[in-house]
Design a protein with these regions (language model features):
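Extracellular, modular beta-sheet/disulfide-rich ectodomains of secreted and cell-surface proteins
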Residues: 1-59
């Protein structure tokens, strides 16, 4: 499980070796964490934005 936090509503990348996907395990922010809008993943890892703070399971 990886914690990834958007501070000051800025986009933040969190390093992760993603093979099959990422699942949001627990949202820690009042700001919504919506896949494809305020969080997602790519070859660099997990990204969050607009105040999304959450814990993610990497598969």
């Amino acid at each position: 499980v990886i914690a990834c936090h958007s501070n000051d509503r800025r986009q933040q990348y969190c390093d992760a070796q993603v093979r099959r996907g990422v699942r949001l395990v627990r949202q820690e922010s009042r700001s919504a964490c919506v896949e494809g809008q305020t969080w997602g993943w790519d070859r660099r890892g997990i990204w969050v934005s607009n105040g999304c703070r959450a814990q993610f399971q990497v598969n």
